[in-house]
Amino acid sequence: MTKRALISVSDKSGIIDFAKELKNLGWDIISTGGTKVALDNAGVETIAIDDVTGFPEMMDGRVKTLHPNIHGGLLARRDADSHLQAAKDNNIELIDLVVVNLYPFKETILRPDVTYDLAVENIDIGGPSMLRSAAKNHASVTVVADPADYATVLGELADAGQTTFETRQRLAAKVFRHTAAYDALIAEYFTTQVGEAKPEKLTITYDLKQAMRYGENPQQDADFYQKALPTDYSIASAKQLNGKELSFNNIRDADAAIRIIRDFKDRPTVVVLKHMNPCGIGQADDIETAWDYAYEADPVSIFGGIVVLNREVDAATAKKMHPIFLEIIIAPSYSEEALAILTNKKKNLRILELPFDAQAASEVEAEYTGVVGGLLVQNQDVVAENPSDWQVVTDRQPTEQEATALEFAWKAIKYVKSNGIIITNDHMTLGLGAGQTNRVGSVKIAIEQAKDHLDGAVLASDAFFPFADNIEEIAAAGIKAIIQPGGSVRDQDSIDAANKHGLTMIFTGVRHFRH
């Protein structure tokens, strides 16, 4: 009996050659719509779908393959006599191979001019149904949704006249992933359209971006996935201009770096980061000076660090960066001369280019944190804060220079691991206390790091001070200005201690824990 294939594809890459090879192997081909036209024009003889179903394509193509003559031919078990008899009794011919890919829903909704009606019309119904029927019956039917699998299928058909069970099973699994992701994307689109903030089912889909050598540690397997609807301002979308493949830890650090730099838009700014904590932030009127400040903030920790700059990297800045061992440099652009300098004898230095004009859109993306047996979902900590809403709670008001420095410190503290303390002046970080289990411990570490640069320095805390001992440590170091959320039942103790030492202290009313 002549074997039959059903081919209906929106992505026609490689399909002509595939179909010609099938014909050479003696297969009959059923086809639909535009696919049939393309195959016929290429000289590949096909059977029209309506010759199989006995019904014409109708309703603008919405109904063409949803018919027992199609799904019976796909779902009939070859090892079940009752199935084969039912097919014979109803004049249903078996279909042994399905090649289908789906309407371009993703590509459609990514179009800037897309309308709701156009999106709806690009929801495929018949395609997923055929794929799922064929995949369910993979014991007998081969199903292909990806042109990358054409060669494998043709090779096995040419060698043995049929595909192996292992191949059919693998392709079926791939199809079920494919249709699930397709439906998840549609669900995500409709959830957004109706404004459902807390859906009872969370369906999101990601595409494999990079198979990784290992994860956070060599004993951990890992892979990198990108959202099916890509975020332009993300490490997944960054253009790599030089260097080795990004590692798992590289990606996490780089992601933290581009989140930090988002908050520093107004002036040229450089952020240096290690282990997801900023170890140096500098800002100035030009990017070269901003680099100088970021480097001076911690010239030891910068070794092997990640650097992100919010302005084009020029030659002068590149010359200063080049001698230092860095893992990654990220910027919106690089001058031709700067790129030549940075890549000279630095084949492993990872250099990324990222569209900073897409930052705002990235802020609305949810954050997902895996826990054993579950997933936490929250919006990002990107609340707009206005210094005019802050409250000076001490007798002394901040000076103009202190006010500027406190704003700078408050931006920086958001990205320090809790319990987080940061000491800065008005243009660079000076000391960092991160990740301690008690706040006074973080205060002491930050002061120790900044001890030679405390003149005119200010201090920020990501959460309230639970006891006045923190204020005593800060005052003893000579720091005169503090910014913190407030909110402790012992706030008054901290205020009294600050007043006793002539400090100025601001309460913002907003906490910035980072775990």
From Swiss-Prot:
It catalyses: (6R)-10-formyltetrahydrofolate + 5-amino-1-(5-phospho-beta-D-ribosyl)imidazole-4-carboxamide = 5-formamido-1-(5-phospho-D-ribosyl)imidazole-4-carboxamide + (6S)-5,6,7,8-tetrahydrofolate; IMP + H2O = 5-formamido-1-(5-phospho-D-ribosyl)imidazole-4-carboxamide. Pathway: Purine metabolism; IMP biosynthesis via de novo pathway; 5-formamido-1-(5-phospho-D-ribosyl)imidazole-4-carboxamide from 5-amino-1-(5-phospho-D-ribosyl)imidazole-4-carboxamide (10-formyl THF route): step 1/1; Purine metabolism; IMP biosynthesis via de novo pathway; IMP from 5-formamido-1-(5-phospho-D-ribosyl)imidazole-4-carboxamide: step 1/1. Residues 1-145 form the MGS-like domain. Keywords: Hydrolase, Multifunctional enzyme, Purine biosynthesis, Transferase. Signal peptide: none annotated. It holds the Pfam family MGS. GO terms for biological process: 'de novo' IMP biosynthetic process. Its EC number is 2.1.2.3, 3.5.4.10. The keyword Oxidoreductase does not apply. One of its GO terms (cellular component) is cytosol. PROSITE patterns: MGS. GO terms for molecular function: IMP cyclohydrolase activity; phosphoribosylaminoimidazolecarboxamide formyltransferase activity. The keyword Nucleotidyltransferase does not apply. Gene3D superfamilies: 3.40.140.20, Methylglyoxal synthase-like domain (3.40.50.1380). PANTHER family: BIFUNCTIONAL PURINE BIOSYNTHESIS PROTEIN ATIC, BIFUNCTIONAL PURINE BIOSYNTHESIS PROTEIN PURH. Belongs to the PurH family. The IMP cyclohydrolase activity resides in the N-terminal region. This is Bifunctional purine biosynthesis protein PurH. It comes from Streptococcus pyogenes serotype M49 (strain NZ131).
